[in-house]
Regions:
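Glycan-recognition surfaces
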Residues: 1-73
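Active-site-adjacent structural elements in folded domains
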Residues: 44-46, 104-109, 158
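Short, glycine-/Ser/Thr-/acidic-enriched flexible segments
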Residues: 45, 66, 73, 115, ...
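Carbohydrate-binding surface patches
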Residues: 55, 59-62, 67, 102-141
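Aromatic- and carboxylate-lined catalytic core of secreted/periplasmic carbohydrate-active enzymes
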Residues: 56-101
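A residue-level signal for conserved active-site and pocket-lining positions in enzyme catalytic cores
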Residues: 61, 147, 168
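Solvent-exposed beta-hairpin/edge-strand motifs
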Residues: 138-153
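C-terminal beta-strand-rich structural cap/linker in extracellular carbohydrate-active enzymes
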Residues: 157-176
Length: 176
């Protein structure tokens, strides 16, 4: 299975994610953030489906310049949608790392949507095995709020505070 194979490309994703979230506060203050190129194609790409979704999520949350490295005419429709999301909604959120000093690569990125101030949180698993992360969702969303994952549509209650993630995946939680 694709998810089980060893991936030599994935480490750069976590390192770039560490850099872009740790430097996010400088975006539009000292410079315009310039993360790495977005790659969504299936051919000539070592990233798994989960890793591509994780990378897209990170770019969506931090904003900044968007460089697409794919020919839209050759992209599978579901992959083209990932790139279109980034192009249609640049600088959608104002994000920051909640766990900046708790781990080498921050895994919990809180954000507010710039258009209306609605809260959002990205929870990332950059590790090579499944993780259950404790996330203080109540402080971000309030008590008893139903949250929905942007990618899967799954819902959880903010009171749970536990987010289970397979390796190299993420969720983007917003109010349902």
């Amino acid at each position: 299975r694709e998810e089980d194979r060893a991936n030599t490309e994935a480490p750069w994703v976590s390192y770039v994610c560490r850099n872009i979230i740790n430097r996010r506060y400088m975006h539009k203050r000292l410079w315009i953030n310039d993360p790495d190129v977005h790659i969504a194609r299936k051919d000539n790409n070592e990233l798994t489906e989960n890793e591509i979704q994780l990378w897209t999520s990170a770019l969506w949350l931090v904003g900044g310049l968007v460089l697409i490295s794919d020919r839209f005419s050759t992209l599978a429709p579901e992959r083209a949608e990932l790139s279109k999301l980034l192009l249609a909604q640049t600088d959608t959120f104002d994000a920051y790392p909640v766990d900046l000093f708790d781990r080498e690569i921050p895994a919990i990125w809180a954000a507010k949507r710039n258009s209306d101030g609605a809260p959002c949180v990205g929870v990332f698993n950059f590790e090579d095995d499944a993780q259950t992360l404790d996330v203080d969702l109540v402080s971000i969303f309030g008590k008893g709020v139903t949250l929905k994952d942007h990618w899967t549509g799954r819902t959880i209650l903010s009171d749970s505070g536990k987010v289970e993630l397979p390796k190299h995946t993420c969720v983007i939680l917003m109010k349902a």
